């Protein structure tokens, strides 16, 4: 029973995050700055947003994503 509840929670969480990310992408597509990381939800520092306009990931998540790409490349 616990496994079913865990799976339902996981699916619900995934659907929620997908919806949130779609909204963030629409906002970003209209030139409104994204202040929160799309992966973890932490704030993206202003200096990073100025240096990399349109950035959607914080430094930590960007580094993680780049490591994953190297690992699978």
From Swiss-Prot:
UniProt key word Metal-binding: yes
Keywords of this entry: Metal-binding, Plasmid, Zinc, Zinc-finger
Zinc fingers (dksA C4-type) by residue: 37-61
InterPro entries: Znf_C4-type_bac, Znf_C4_TraR, Znf_DskA_TraR, Znf_DskA_TraR_CS
A GO molecular function held by the record: zinc ion binding
UniProt xrefs under SUPFAM superfamilies: Glucocorticoid receptor-like (DNA-binding domain)
Pfam hit, one: zf-dskA_traR
Database matches in PANTHER family: DNAK SUPPRESSOR PROTEIN (PTHR38777:SF1), FELS-2 PROPHAGE PROTEIN (PTHR38777)
Protein's recorded name: Protein TraR
The species this protein was found in: Escherichia coli (strain K12)
Gene designation per UniProt: traR
